[in-house]
């Protein structure tokens, strides 16, 4: 499954993996998964976190390593039921629920994920996605960016 990913995708997933793997030991624990999900405004129970880990934990050691993470991401990308997931992700970014992601909202989410971005980097991300040039990202623009990945 993961062998169908491009070099770019793999390096992006490596970056995402390291956001979860807070202590850098190469494994994502339920605690680390919980930290990231809570920073995104979710509130999973310990049992839900354990279920999520178990779902992808191929070797049964109770954590997710990078190959397992890659398989999960490859499966998610193939999953055509991504419309609902995209809406959910958009809502995470769109803090005030006005239908747009502003630079401030983007910065807020990225900071919560542990990504310290300069104003220039945030503006650049907005510009890349902002097709109609209004300085923010609407849902259609968000979908385009997410599907291009």
From Swiss-Prot:
Annotated binding of Ca(2+) 2, by residue: 57, 59, 61, 63, 68
Gene Ontology molecular-function annotations: calcium ion binding
Stored SMART domains: EFh
Domain (EF-hand) ranges: 8-43, 44-79, 81-116, 117-149
InterPro entries associated with the record: CALM/Myosin/TropC-like (IPR050230), EF-hand-dom_pair (IPR011992), EF_Hand_1_Ca_BS (IPR018247), EF_hand_dom (IPR002048)
Residues the entry annotates as binding Ca(2+) 4: 130, 132, 134, 136, 141
Modified residues (N6,N6,N6-trimethyllysine): 116
Binding site for Ca(2+) 1: 21, 23, 25, 27, 32
Binding site for Ca(2+) 3: 94, 96, 98, 105
Name of the protein: Calmodulin
Keyword Repeat: yes
Record's keyword terms, sorted: Acetylation, Calcium, Metal-binding, Methylation, Repeat
Role summary: Calmodulin mediates the control of a large number of enzymes, ion channels and other proteins by Ca(2+). Among the enzymes to be stimulated by the calmodulin-Ca(2+) complex are a number of protein kinases and phosphatases.
Family the entry assigns: Belongs to the calmodulin family.
SUPFAM superfamilies in the record: EF-hand (SSF47473)
Organism: Helianthus annuus (Common sunflower)
Additional comment: This protein has four functional calcium-binding sites.
Modified residues (N-acetylalanine): 2
Claim: Translocase is one of the keywords in the record: no
